[in-house]
Structures are given as C-alpha cells and as structure tokens.
Amino acid sequence: MGILGQGNYSLTAGIIPDRVPYPLLENHLGNNFIFYNTNSFNMMRFFEFTSNRFFSLQYTQYLEGLITNRLPIIKKLNWRNHFTFNYLIGDLEERFNTNGALNSLNGKPYIEIGYGFSNIFRFLRVDFVHRLTHLNNTSTVFESNPPKFSIKISAQIRL
C-alpha cells in the first residue's frame, strides 16, 4: 500500500446446511486472555456466539512508521503503530437451536477495532481493542455484559 505501509487480511465464510451436533456448528473464536490473538475476536468471550451461516473479515494495517516517525522519542525507539478491524456477521437457524441455549448474532454484525504499537524491544506488541457492537449481551451463560475495552499484549517477530 506504499506510503500507508502493509495490510494483512483474512476472509472466512461458511454455511452448515444440515442439522449437526452443537460442536460441529461454528463457535466463533473468542479471547478472554490478556494476550492478543490475530486469529480470534479479541473482545468476544469464549463460546459467546454460534452460527450456521457466517462471514468474517479480519484486517490489520501496519503503518511502518507513518505516524510514529513524526514523534522524535518514538522514532528513536523504532516503535511502529498499527490498526486492526474485525468484522463478523452470522445467523443461527431455529432448527439448530431447538432448546434456545445457543447465543446467535441474529444477523447483527459484531465489530471490534484496535490500534497499538509493535516493535517494542524488537518483539513486543501492545494493542488497545474496542468492542463496538453487542455491548449488552447477557444470556443464560453470561451473567454480565462483556467488556467494551481491553489492553492486550503479544510477542511477534516481523522481518
């Protein structure tokens, strides 16, 4: 992307047409830990949403110093900033949820955005992640609302 750095994306879609046992449905990957996971929805709780039809987009834009090089201290430390965008839409047909215990997106998108710094001590990464939708998501499994904001850390080596 030239001056904007490098972008990475992941598209996933799926349809489960026939009735199957619960473990074979799509249980979207959540992350309750303090560690950032590039392959999960980092503000979603484990087993929070289940779908038989879904589409997801996960996008990360590495700005390669576009903003941080304008700040002398950050430039000297060689930190890099990045932005993330995670989108998921899905649905669970009633025939898959006969007892009503499964929580579905019901066609309403799940969105989270994040920003952060990487290359801290050459391998650490810190992400600030915000959950934008499904903020009041209580069910029989979860008694409280999910968090709206979290700070996640991870280790990565980008050559």
Spans of model-derived segments:
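Exposed, low-structure sequence patches enriched in small/polar residues
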Residues: M1-L159
